[in-house]
Amino acid sequence: MSRYRGPRVKIIRRLGALPGLTSKTLKSKSNYIDRSTPNKKVSQYRIRLEEKQKLRSHYGLAERQLLKYMRIARKAKGSTGQILLQLLEMRLDNTIFRLGMSPTIPGARQLVNHRHISINNDVVDIPSYNCEPGDIITIGNKQKSRFIITKNINSFQRLKIPSHLIFDSTQLRGSVNQMINREWINLKINELLVVEYYSRQV
C-alpha cells in the first residue's frame, strides 16, 4: 500500500487530529458516529486498523515502511509500542518538523529531498535517516534554503519544541541531545493497538 496523497481534510475527519499531516483540526467522523448510533458496535479489528492508519498518516509512511519499523521494534529490548514510536520520532523528516523548520512532516520531507538539510556538516537527502543524540542539523548555505526555512520558522514555530531537541534561532541550527521520551510525542495514539494489529504479521 503506497503513501496516501489525497485530501488531508478527509483523513483528519475520519481519524482525528494529525499534527504531522496538517495543522487543521476537525470534528472526527468517528465521534459523530458514536453519538448518533450509540448501540452500534465497532469491531476490535476496526479499532486497531484505524489506530494503525492514524500512525501511518501522521508520519506519512507506506504500509511496507511501517511494517519494517514494526519488525525492528519487535526485535529490540523493551516495550515494542514505545520503541516503534521512538523509531518514527527520530526520523529526520519528523525531527525537522518537531524543530519547527516545517509546518508538516510532508513539508519537512520535501526539504530533505531537495537537499536543504545537513547533518554534522554532511548533506542528507534521506527523510528516513535515523537521528541520534549528538547530531547537529543545519541548513544549506544556499540563499533559497535559508529563505524557505526562515519563513517556516517565523510562520509555524509556534508549538513547544520537545525536550530532546534544541534549536538555535540565530544560527538556524538544531541539535539532538537525547532519545525522545514517550511523553514528548505530540500525537494522540494508543501504540498497543498498533502492536496488536501487526501481531500476526511480524
UniProtKB/Swiss-Prot annotation:
| Biological source species | Plagiochila adianthoides
Tell me the ranges covered by the S4 RNA-binding domain, including all copies. 90-151
SUPFAM superfamilies according to UniProt: Alpha-L RNA-binding motif
Q: Which PANTHER family match?
A: 30S 40S RIBOSOMAL PROTEIN, SMALL RIBOSOMAL SUBUNIT PROTEIN US4M
Which GO molecular function terms does the record list?
rRNA binding; structural constituent of ribosome
Record-linked Gene3D superfamilies: Ribosomal Protein S4 Delta 41, Chain A, domain 1, RNA-binding S4 domain
Q: Which UniProt keywords apply?
A: Chloroplast, Plastid, Ribonucleoprotein, Ribosomal protein, RNA-binding, rRNA-binding
| CDD domains linked | S4
- What lineage does UniProt assign to this protein's organism? Eukaryota, Viridiplantae, Streptophyta, Embryophyta, Marchantiophyta
Q: What does this protein do?
A: One of the primary rRNA binding proteins, it binds directly to 16S rRNA where it nucleates assembly of the body of the 30S subunit. With S5 and S12 plays an important role in translational accuracy.
| Name of this chain's protein | Small ribosomal subunit protein uS4c
**What superkingdom does the record give?**
Eukaryota
- The coding gene here is rps4
Q: Which family does it belong to?
A: Belongs to the universal ribosomal protein uS4 family.
Q: Which SMART domains match?
A: Ribosomal_S4 (SM01390), S4 (SM00363)
Q: Which GO terms describe its biological process?
A: ribosomal small subunit biogenesis; translation
Q: Which GO terms describe its cellular component?
A: chloroplast; small ribosomal subunit
Q: Where in the cell is it found?
A: Plastid, Chloroplast
**Regions that span the bilayer:** none
Please tell me where this protein is predominantly located: plastid
- Keyword Ribonucleoprotein annotated: yes
Q: Describe the protein's quaternary organization and the partners it interacts with.
A: Part of the 30S ribosomal subunit. Contacts protein S5. The interaction surface between S4 and S5 is involved in control of translational fidelity.
